[in-house]
């Protein structure tokens, strides 16, 4: 009887410790550097902003073939504001203003492709799409740590559900 009680105490304390200090950072705004370019403008620059990133708890069924899949949540924008910058050197007739999102708060929710990169493989890390800027090792090539904002899926408000 005492072994069962000891096991119960150890398991309950372990759960308490895990809930106080999550193993992975939760969904929250983090600082990020994004590449900004526009078709027709001969420049690619980087901007500092905040994006939503982090862990969202999810579950999966053990018997996936028998029961329907559970919806999976991802780290999404809750509150966002947009800021604009003017790209230098754009030719006459090309609007040099580009807007980008700044995450104010985040939430774990179903992935909405209209506002969120729902994952998947990326061709390139955070780089400019124009090949003139990709081969350069100048400051125009941003660090290879984040996906390019131009690689986001097309707008749609349909949530991504597991197959």
From Swiss-Prot:
Q: Which residues are glycosylated?
A: 31, 48
Q: Name one GO cellular component term.
A: extracellular space
The opening ranks of the lineage are: Eukaryota, Metazoa, Chordata, Craniata, Vertebrata
Pfam families the UniProt entry points to: Cys_knot
Organism listed in the record: Homo sapiens
Query: Signal sequence: where?
Result: 1-18
GO biological process, any: G protein-coupled receptor signaling pathway
Q: What is this protein called?
A: Choriogonadotropin subunit beta variant 2
Q: Where is this region: Disordered?
A: 129-163
Composition bias, Pro residues = 141-152
List all membrane-crossing ranges: none
Principal localization? secreted
Print the miscellaneous field: Encoded by a cluster of genes that have evolved by duplication from LHB. HCG-beta is encoded by six non-allelic genes (CGB) clustered on chromosome 19q13.3 and named CGB1, CGB2, CGB3, CGB5, CGB7 and CGB8. Two specific hCGb proteins that differ by three amino acids in positions 2,4 and 117 have been described: type 1 (CGB7) and type 2 (CGB3, CGB5, CGB8). The CGB gene first arose in the common ancestor of the anthropoid primates.
Disulphide bonds in the chain: 27-75, 41-90, 44-128, 52-106, 56-108, 111-118
A GO MF label: hormone activity
Question: Which tissues carry this protein?
Answer: Expressed in placenta, testis and pituitary.
UniProtKB keywords: Disulfide bond, Glycoprotein, Hormone, Secreted, Signal
Compartments annotated for it: namely: Secreted
Protein family per UniProt = Belongs to the glycoprotein hormones subunit beta family.
Give the matching InterPro entries: Cystine-knot_cytokine, Glyco_hormone_CN, Gonadotropin_bsu, Gonadotropin_bsu_CS
